Design a protein with these regions (language model features):
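Beta-strand-loop-alpha-helix segment that lines the small-molecule cofactor/substrate pocket
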Residues: 1-38, 53
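Short, well-ordered coil/turn segments that N-cap beta-strands
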Residues: 2, 29-30, 57-59, 169-171
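Structural detector of well-ordered beta-strand residues that form the stable sheet scaffold
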Residues: 5, 30-32, 62, 112, ...
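Predominantly a Rossmann-like dinucleotide-binding segment in NAD(P)-dependent oxidoreductases
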Residues: 37-153
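Glycine-rich phosphate/pyrophosphate-binding beta-alpha loops
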Residues: 94, 172-179
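Secondary-structure transition into beta-strands, especially the periplasmic turns and strand N-termini
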Residues: 105-107, 168-173
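Histidine- and/or cysteine-centered catalytic micro-motif in compact active-site loops
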Residues: 116, 168, 177-179
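Active-site beta-strand termini and strand-to-loop segments that position acidic
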Residues: 158, 163-170
């Protein structure tokens, strides 16, 4: 019965998510998933503007997340493997997609997506960083992406993704994640 704040993602598999939701429902436990971007001032202001009607009715939403400097760390540790992290769509896009849903006041009911490993598969400098803390290997000056060093020995998740979504309200949305 104690309320639970759970950092996203809810789980990394549908089975895991179903188990968490079922348990919360069966026990009457309040569950809040930590989608923290909706609490950022700029996002709250966007929602206020939309709700005020000043820009008319939302018909489409477009979001391009240029992962850029700093996003590389997802390819230097356990995030780089599908087994442990399932990829950037779950780890990073979850924030952006939550904001898109929140701004549209609607959820996705149709989606088509594709992604590929197109950038970091070209970097040959690999290292096992599992014994290090992130601060020991993170460097904000690693740019461009192909200059990266010490990437995880195994990278089997996409580094580029695109999605098209149709929301319950009829809003069409597109999302792109690139480096």
């Amino acid at each position: 019965g104690v309320a639970v704040y759970l950092e996203k993602p809810l789980a990394i598999t549908m089975e895991g998510a179903t188990r968490v939701l079922r348990t919360a429902y069966e026990t009457g436990t309040k569950l809040y998933v930590g989608h923290n971007m909706r609490h950022m001032n700029v996002v709250r202001e966007m929602r206020n503007i939309i709700r005020s009607g000043r820009i008319g009715e939302v018909k489409t939403i477009w979001c391009r997340h240029f992962v850029g400097t700093g996003g590389d760390f997802y390819f230097k540790d356990w995030h780089a493997t599908r087994e442990h992290g399932t990829g950037l769509l779950l780890q990073k896009a979850a924030h952006d997609i939550d904001v898109m849903h929140w701004l549209a006041d609607s959820h996705t009911n149709d989606v088509v997506a594709m992604g590929d490993l197109m950038v970091y598969n070209q970097v040959t400098d690999r290292a096992d960083n599992s014994h290090l803390l992130m601060g020991d290997w993170f460097d904000n000056n690693n740019w461009p992406p192909l200059s990266q060093k010490g990437l995880n020995p195994v990278i089997d998740v996409e580094d580029v993704s695109m999605m098209l979504m149709r929301m319950e309200s009829g809003v069409l949305a597109s999302y792109e994640q690139c480096h």
